[in-house]
Amino acid sequence: MAANLLFSEDQIKEYKTKFDAFDRNNDGNFPTMFLGNAMKSVGHVLTAAELENSRRVRKGTTTFPQFLAMILDKKCRKVFKAMDKDDKDKLLSADEVRQAMLSFDRQITEDKIKEMIEKADFPNDGKCSLEEFVKMVMNFC
């Protein structure tokens, strides 16, 4: 799972503890109606639209892998916005993508970053949109 490469073991344990607080039946999921509070417990606020979409997609429950994916999605968006220095075109250059990936994982190699960028095949003149960045990170293994 990509989360193991992008979150430290301590972070995963912390997120699991937060998740377990909402998994009151100890059955590996919690009702999606608690997702907003669960995300807030790890420092992320979901918009009303994100909550509504999650309720539709998750069909009533949220598992730990889904919870980690939502945290990762929020983290990707935060990193993207921090790295998009000019904020005019809402795109990251290859160098900004490299810096963003290093902010996720200090152990990642330049070769791995280059490979990821090449595989992502950004259609915007070699630049990466927010959606492309999130997809690239989610596929990172």
From Swiss-Prot:
Q: What SMART domains does the database record attribute to this sequence?
A: EFh (SM00054)
* Sorted UniProt keywords: Calcium, Metal-binding, Repeat
Which body tissues produce this protein?
Answer: Found in cell lineages giving rise to the aboral ectoderm, a squamous epithelium covering the surface of the late stage embryo and larva.
Q: Which Gene Ontology biological process is one annotated for this entry?
A: microtubule cytoskeleton organization
What's a Gene Ontology MF term here? enzyme regulator activity
EF-hand domain location is 10-42, 43-72, 73-107, 108-141
One cellular-component annotation, GO: cytoplasm
Instruction: Tell me which residues bind Ca(2+) 3.
Output: D121, D125, K127, E132
Q: Is Aminoacyl-tRNA synthetase among the key words of this record?
A: no
Where is Ca(2+) 2 bound in this sequence?
A: D84, D86, K90, D95
Residues that bind Ca(2+) 1, according to the entry? D23, N25, D27, N29
What SUPFAM superfamilies does the record tag this protein with? EF-hand (SSF47473)
Q: Per its UniProt record, what InterPro entries does this chain match?
A: Centrin_CML-like (IPR050145), EF-hand-dom_pair (IPR011992), EF_hand_dom (IPR002048)
Q: Which PANTHER family match?
A: CALCIUM BINDING PROTEIN (PTHR23050)
- Name the job this protein performs: Calcium-binding protein involved in larval development and metamorphosis. Likely to function as calcium buffers mediating the transport of calcium from the sea water to the blastocoel where calcium is required for skeleton formation.
The protein here is known as Calcium-binding protein SPEC 2D
Organism from which the protein derives: Strongylocentrotus purpuratus (Purple sea urchin)
- List the lineage, top down: Eukaryota, Metazoa, Echinodermata, Eleutherozoa, Echinozoa
